[in-house]
């Protein structure tokens, strides 16, 4: 896939959604747009997963020093 940046893929995904929601595409064009949207969504999800793995929280200990810990989402 030629897309290198999350922001670029997200913009393309938004454009696809807008075209699909317009109701002006033929069935064939709608299917092509849908396929493109699925690819962009998968790319964005992959990039977000990669970013989440890199995020760390810097926590202050009682003695005043800091410790890095992996970021974890709380279960709802």
UniProtKB/Swiss-Prot annotation:
Molecular-function annotations in GO: exodeoxyribonuclease VII activity
UniProt entry tagged with the keyword Cytoplasm: yes
Keywords: Cytoplasm, Exonuclease, Hydrolase, Nuclease
Enzyme Commission numbers on file: 3.1.11.6
Alphabetical list of NCBIfam families matching this protein: PRK00977.1-4, PRK14066.1, xseB
Major subcellular site: cytoplasm
Chain's gene name: xseB
Subcellular location per the Swiss-Prot or TrEMBL entry: Cytoplasm
Gene3D superfamilies: Exonuclease VII, small subunit
Quaternary context: Heterooligomer composed of large and small subunits.
Top-tier EC class: hydrolase
A biological process term (GO) from this entry: DNA catabolic process
InterPro entries, alphabetized: Exonuc_VII_S (IPR003761), Exonuc_VII_ssu_sf (IPR037004)
Native source species: Geobacter metallireducens (strain ATCC 53774 / DSM 7210 / GS-15)
Family: Belongs to the XseB family.
HAMAP family: Exonuc_7_S
GO CC terms of this entry: cytosol; exodeoxyribonuclease VII complex
Catalytic activity: Exonucleolytic cleavage in either 5'- to 3'- or 3'- to 5'-direction to yield nucleoside 5'-phosphates
Pfam family, one: Exonuc_VII_S
Function: Bidirectionally degrades single-stranded DNA into large acid-insoluble oligonucleotides, which are then degraded further into small acid-soluble oligonucleotides.
SUPFAM superfamilies: XseB-like
Name assigned to this protein: Exodeoxyribonuclease 7 small subunit
């Amino acid at each position: 896939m030629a897309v290198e940046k999350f922001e670029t893929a997200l913009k393309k995904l938004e454009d696809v959604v807008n075209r699909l929601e317009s109701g002006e595409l033929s069935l064939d064009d709608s299917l092509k747009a849908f396929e493109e949207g699925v690819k962009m969504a998968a790319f964005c999800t992959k990039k977000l997963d990669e970013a989440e793995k890199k995020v760390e929280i810097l926590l202050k200990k009682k003695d005043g020093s800091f410790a890095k810990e992996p970021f974890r989402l709380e279960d709802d």
